[in-house]
C-alpha cells in the first residue's frame, strides 16, 4: 500500500499525520531530532497507528528504505520548498505537499477566508474570528496561528461536528508556496514589506507568492494604505480597498474608509466610530477596516460588527499592554519579528520609550525603524544573538539615546526597569525587530518569558 511520509513532529506535521491517517493513508513521520519531548509525541502517535522514526534528517538516505512504497511527502512550513532533498524526491516522481494543501483537500468544500501579509495578519485573523463568532457564526481559525489547519479538518470529521460557516485561516508565504491549489472564498492582504528574503530571495518572488493567493480568491480585500499594494492597484481587475486616510481619489477610491470625524464608512454611509476598537496605532485602524470589509461580505450588519469590536480583548504578544511600573506602561510586542513591524509598534506607543530589541536578525530595510527609535526611544537595550550587529547599526544611524547590550532577555529586563524609571520613560516596550529562534522556540515563548520576568514588578 502506498505510504505518505510527513517530515517533522511540529504542530503542522502532527496535524497532517493525524488527518492523513484518519483519511485511510499509511503514514510515517520522520523527525531529525531525538529530544525527550519528541519521544513522548512519537509515542502518542504510535498509539494512534502512525509510524514515527526519530533521528532522521532531511536527507535522501532517510527516505531510501521507503522509496518503493512512497507516494507523497508532506512538509512543514519551516522547510524550504526548493530544499535539495525535496528536489531529488520530485525527480523520482514523488509528490511534495505542504500541510496546508492536505488540509485544503479535506476542507475545500467549505468557504475559506484566507489572511496573508507581512505584518498584521495575526491580529486580523483573531479579530475577524471574534467578530464572526460573537455574532453566532461558526468560524474556527487556524493555519499559521492557533490550530494547524489539518487539526481543524480533523475536528470537522468528528461525529456530530457542526458544519463551520466560515474557516478563518492565516497563511504565511511559506504555507502559500507549498499549497498553490488553495482558492479561498475571500482573501485579505494586509501589507507587503521585505521579509523572509533569506528564504524567497527577492521581494518580487515574495510578492508573487502572496499575490497568487489573492488571484485565486473569489472576493479580494486589500489595504490601500500600504505603499506596495497601492502601487500594484492598477494590476487588479477587481477587489475591495480600505483606507484609514479617507475615501481616496477619483482613480483610487476606497470601498471602506475612515473619515475626518473618525467614522468608518462605506459608499452607502457611515457604519460606526473607529474608536470601537480600543487598540493603539494607525496600523490597527487598517486592521479594523479589513475586518469590517470582510464581515460585511458575510452579511453582518454594522451594529453587530461594532459591538464585537468593542468586546475584542486584543491579541497576546501584539502590542499587548501588561500593566504599569510606576509611570511606565509596559507592552509586549514579541510578534514584531522584523524592522517594519517594530517600527509600526514603536509609532503606536507613547514616547519616550525604553525599547528591548534583539534575537536572530533578518534581512530588510532598517531605515524606518532607526528613524523611529531616534524619535521615540530614550534608550535601547539589545539582547540575544544579534545584539552586536544591531548595536553597530544603531550607533551608525546616530541614535541620541542610551544604548546597551545584554546577553539575554533576563539581563535586559533587569537593566531596563530602573533605567526607565530614572529616564521617566512613558513606556517599556519589548519590540525585538528580530526572529526568536536564537534563544526561544517561537515568538510566543519569548513573549511569555517577558511576561514572567515583568509580572512581579507591575504596580498596576
From Swiss-Prot:
It catalyses: UDP-N-acetyl-alpha-D-muramoyl-L-alanine + D-glutamate + ATP = UDP-N-acetyl-alpha-D-muramoyl-L-alanyl-D-glutamate + ADP + phosphate + H(+). This is UDP-N-acetylmuramoylalanine--D-glutamate ligase. Belongs to the MurCDEF family. GO terms for biological process: cell division; cell wall organization; peptidoglycan biosynthetic process; regulation of cell shape. ATP binds at residues 117-123. It is an enzyme of class 6 (ligase). Pfam families: Mur_ligase_M, MurD-like_N. Cell wall formation. Catalyzes the addition of glutamate to the nucleotide precursor UDP-N-acetylmuramoyl-L-alanine (UMA). One of its GO terms (molecular function) is ATP binding. SUPFAM superfamilies: MurCD N-terminal domain, MurD-like peptide ligases, catalytic domain, MurD-like peptide ligases, peptide-binding domain. Pathway: Cell wall biogenesis; peptidoglycan biosynthesis. Disulfide bonds: none annotated. Its main location: cytoplasm. Keywords: ATP-binding, Cell cycle, Cell division, Cell shape, Cell wall biogenesis/degradation, Cytoplasm, Ligase, Nucleotide-binding, Peptidoglycan synthesis. Gene3D superfamilies: Mur ligase, C-terminal domain, Mur-like, catalytic domain, NAD(P)-binding Rossmann-like Domain.
